[in-house]
């Protein structure tokens, strides 16, 4: 989208922004509570309220008001008090789900851009869900030229703890950038592999994975 509008946007920008964006949300898979508790705690507006110093509050929205005006209206209308009433049923406080900006769960956001010989232009990792013991690891490279071959290797136990599954040619210039859900799910469902291997791909990862 940025390219179509002639806007220069590189991976390093996302790395820089995430290093300054505090990790505030205690929701699975990286946190403790199911996703519906994010709604109970106030959802996206609560996050916006915590990070509003980083936002352009003067932008116009579909309500006909600016973002800043929308956030003020929520406070005036008792939105956050209503959210706390949901959490009261579980004996929780909002801070159990969404931390204040100055008391975050972490200070490095949720993703990072990695660079190396396998991805010289950069690769994205959601580091908040990576086991700490895997931050530094030496793994065996197991390359596959399509997702189907990788799934078969996982399901037939060809992949062992200590392997790095590499799936190539699944990007936008390959097969159209399909979601790598099935391989991810096969790995996560295996008690031996879930926290002991890595998956690198030019394919797509979205909410499901």
Residue ranges and their predicted role:
Residues 1-209:
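Catalytic or ion-coupling anion/metal-binding cores of large enzyme and transporter domains
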């Amino acid at each position: 989208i940025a390219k179509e509008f002639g806007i220069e946007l590189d991976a390093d920008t996302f790395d820089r922004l995430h290093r300054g964006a505090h990790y505030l949300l205690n929701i699975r898979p990286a946190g403790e509570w199911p996703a519906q508790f994010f709604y109970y705690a106030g959802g996206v507006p609560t996050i916006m309220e915590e990070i509003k110093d980083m936002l352009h509050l003067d932008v116009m929205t579909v309500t006909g008001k600016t973002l800043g005006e929308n956030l003020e209206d929520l406070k005036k209308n008792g939105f956050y008090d209503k959210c706390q009433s949901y959490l009261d049923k579980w004996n929780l406080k909002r801070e159990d789900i969404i931390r204040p900006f100055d008391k975050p769960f972490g200070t490095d956001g949720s993703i990072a851009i990695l660079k190396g010989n396998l991805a010289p232009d950069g690769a994205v990792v959601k580091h908040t869900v990576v086991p700490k013991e895997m931050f530094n690891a030496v793994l065996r490279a197991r390359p596959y030229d399509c997702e189907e071959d990788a799934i078969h290797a996982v399901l037939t136990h060809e992949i062992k703890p200590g392997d790095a599954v590499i799936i190539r040619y699944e990007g936008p210039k390959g097969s159209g950038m399909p979601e790598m859900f099935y391989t991810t799910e096969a790995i996560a469902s295996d008690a031996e592999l879930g926290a002991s291997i890595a998956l690198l791909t030019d394919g797509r990862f979205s909410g499901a994975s």
